[in-house]
């Protein structure tokens, strides 16, 4: 029996790993998040204007945010790339042989790209966004998944509420490239005829005929659900997420606590109280929220003194969430960047090399923070109007989710003090309004310096540190 290998600690993530032939051996857990032992193919099902693309985009954004490499494949976009000008609904008529041929070619081209992404490029989840309304088409896609070793999960969106369908048409389809420069009434009429082209051949997922498939059916954007044969952890995460999202119009307000005493001194972390300007900001925030006249607003804070002091000025009930606490800087808590460079120059350089994955000694990384904040995202998706009073790193993670930012961008998103970000979900994304509340504050944003080498001189390591007392 071979003797156990020696262990060494990864300097970036602080994870113990085997040491072999004088070098650390790369273990699967160091390569990235892996929640399934084989890739997953998510297949959308449903008539046009049922919110399939909305669901596809949200699901893709969520999975990428939690660290699961995911890509959306929209067959409609493949069709637009192949047929440069859209004329009318007649392209979708079931007896239009040329249209049928082109649409099949587009589906096959998309599936070929799915295969490349999942089998060659390291993808974990592909979302195949098309109508897929016939049992024959779904069987073809399922067989494609079987042949390539993928687990297939169907997501069907059924909608019979005419108001919801009409709203989908107005919101999404009239902004579609198919209807650029077309009269609104004419576009609506054409799109309704396009839906009719699919209705006669539409075969919904059936509890008897499709009992061996893994799927979720979503009725009228979340009024009820049918879930069948959830096969693994990633599918259960997908189901849980889809059962939490809604389309009710609302806004989410994100802001940091008022300026703290440690912000003034350029010290990170800790649990300080507000500075005089921070207390002034909390009064301005109270006035701003009052002026907005927001219906049924919920207010959330962390369990740290500075966010609670900020919320107290609002004179409204608020909930304290421990998971909203600032990133734990471990041994670097309450230090200035200059002190970190002086005491831990290697750590300071490693953090600049990969700020998202770098974990402070005895502390956290941004990657850890994202995992910690997932319950907050789930609850934000369930809620309507919410104000979250949090911290710089936490706000960056939440903002990255709503704005679909990559992990490399996330730690450098600008979240200045005394500024409220109003996020309003729209058709396929999020509208952002930045509102500065006219109270001066120190700058706490540090850009990545050009030189991130571990042997760099101190002045080059500290070149982007903001001014402080």
From Swiss-Prot:
GO terms for molecular function: 6-phosphofructo-2-kinase activity; ATP binding; fructose-2,6-bisphosphate 2-phosphatase activity. Signal peptide: none annotated. Keywords: ATP-binding, Hydrolase, Kinase, Multifunctional enzyme, Nucleotide-binding, Phosphoprotein, Transferase. Pfam families: 6PF2K, His_Phos_1. Testis. Its EC number is 2.7.1.105, 3.1.3.46. Residues 1-249 are annotated as: 6-phosphofructo-2-kinase. The modification Phosphoserine is found at residue 29. The keyword Coiled coil does not apply. The modification Phosphothreonine is found at residue 444. InterPro entries: 6Pfruct_kin, 6Phosfructo_kin, His_Pase_superF_clade-1, His_PPase_superfam, P-loop_NTPase, PG/BPGM_mutase_AS. Coiled coil: none annotated. SUPFAM superfamilies: P-loop containing nucleoside triphosphate hydrolases, Phosphoglycerate mutase-like. Residues 250-469 are annotated as: Fructose-2,6-bisphosphatase. It catalyses: beta-D-fructose 2,6-bisphosphate + H2O = beta-D-fructose 6-phosphate + phosphate; beta-D-fructose 6-phosphate + ATP = beta-D-fructose 2,6-bisphosphate + ADP + H(+). It comes from the Eukaryota. GO terms for cellular component: cytosol. Beta-D-fructose 2,6-bisphosphate binds at residues 256, 263, 269, 306, 337, 351, 355, 366, 392, 396. In the C-terminal section; belongs to the phosphoglycerate mutase family. Synthesis and degradation of fructose 2,6-bisphosphate. This is 6-phosphofructo-2-kinase/fructose-2,6-bisphosphatase 4. It comes from Rattus norvegicus (Rat).
